[in-house]
Amino acid sequence: MNIGETERNAVLALLSIYIKGKKYSDCLFFCHLTLEKILKGLVVERTKTHAPYIHKLVDLARIAKVKLNEEQLNHLSRITKFNIAGRYDAFKQTFYKKCNKEYTEKYFNISKKLYLWLKKEYRKK
């Protein structure tokens, strides 16, 4: 296990704490960040270059040549929207209203499943 993997595992553990503490929007942001990090790691591994400074998960998966099914693509597209730092206030307010326990748990579980699947993509030829 390398430092990056240890860090990603720690983030997954932290996310469950955010859910328990009702920090739902933070939890969803970190779901995005965790998937972004693992995808950027795959980009580096497979292209032997630095990962681009982008945050769109579907684009990172494409660059890393990860074969995703339609459901996975849809989930990554939705989870990308959880990275809202530079968005307009109206967008943020709409997002925050969605961030209840059920919505957050749903996407936490989807993110965890995607993360574990992507983890298996390492060293895959």
Which residues does each predicted region cover?
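Terminal alpha-helical segments
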Residues: 1-125
